């Protein structure tokens, strides 16, 4: 799904960002499976930077920490109070719409909005095909050679999981949801709050190691009409 990612341009790091940039927080709740929180800065051109992540994983892939909603909220608030990129900033939170479900009692969103954590969430747009296309649009290289989504190299779980996602064989319009897709979902909610159109002019991705010479750009064959 996102095999177009290349470390030289998609991944980066810096220590500060302008105060007027918007900060977004995406959230995918999990208990037996990992929960995922990602923080994103949006610049004047609409480019998003994933600047920090909190991933509730035991260290075994796709195994959650089994933290309850209030403990997850405490961890999120602690991260925002201790990170200089986030401390004191107004942060817009968008999350899986499922956390607003009140059919079995108080919703996760309501629990996390209470004292002492005061986390406010908006329900994310869960439209899967449109969200997948936003990933493609964001990761494509524009005329300036840069994608519209860049990821700090400290976001290790994004870098580990996102490039490995594959399509669902029974529904090729979507990814296989049996995979470790929690970061994908959390990021998708933020992308859908900041939609962009497909770039009119894109650059091909840089060539990677190709020991079997499978990249057609290496083909030196030329055909002449005679």
Region spans (language model):
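Residue-level detector of short, conserved catalytic/binding motifs and their immediate flanks
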Residues: 35, 91, 184
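Acidic, Mg2+-coordinating catalytic module of metal-dependent nucleases/exonucleases
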Residues: 177-203
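Mg2+-dependent endonuclease catalytic cores in nucleic-acid-processing enzymes, primarily RNase H-like
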Residues: 46-176, 197-202, 206-207, 212-213, ...
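ATPase catalytic-site recognition across NTP-hydrolyzing enzymes
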Residues: 1-29
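Short beta-strand scaffold segments in enzyme catalytic cores
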Residues: 35-40, 188
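Extended hydrophobic secondary-structure segments
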Residues: 32-34, 101
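Short, flexible loop/turn elements at secondary-structure junctions
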Residues: 29-31, 97
